[in-house]
Amino acid sequence: MQSTTTNPIRWTTADLAIFEGDRSKRYEIIDGELFVTRAPDWKHQAVCSNIVALLKFWSDQSGLGQAAINPGIIFSESDNVIPDVVWASHERLERLLDEAGHLTAAPELVIEVLSPGKTNERRDREAKLKLYSVRGVLEYWIVS
């Protein structure tokens, strides 16, 4: 008897570069697995905006770093994510940005605002938690 095994597709950053997907969706790769989600809703984005406003106020006062909404982080060919909010010190930010303006390593702080749905929750509470831990993110906040 012959057995067959199916190897799951392992997505890469190069695949996303040529992928002509629906631009109203968010495409992320974690450990080669493709996660496709709808664009965040108004409430989700309002929460992100409020968080960034507070971080920006603090950053302007302290002069220590910068915050951003939805920056791409390309950790590797098989790990490419778009967190809701990040904060990075000026010192670290200089080392992290590539020529295209993407982060290429861990910022100090990553914040994800939970969207409804088991798949979204699993991605943020499990897959992204593991990824950010392994890649050196110092603080990971999940806002629900």
Q: Residue spans of the language-model regions?
A:
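Gly/Pro/Ser/Thr-rich low-complexity, intrinsically disordered segments predominantly at protein N-termini
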Residues: 1-144
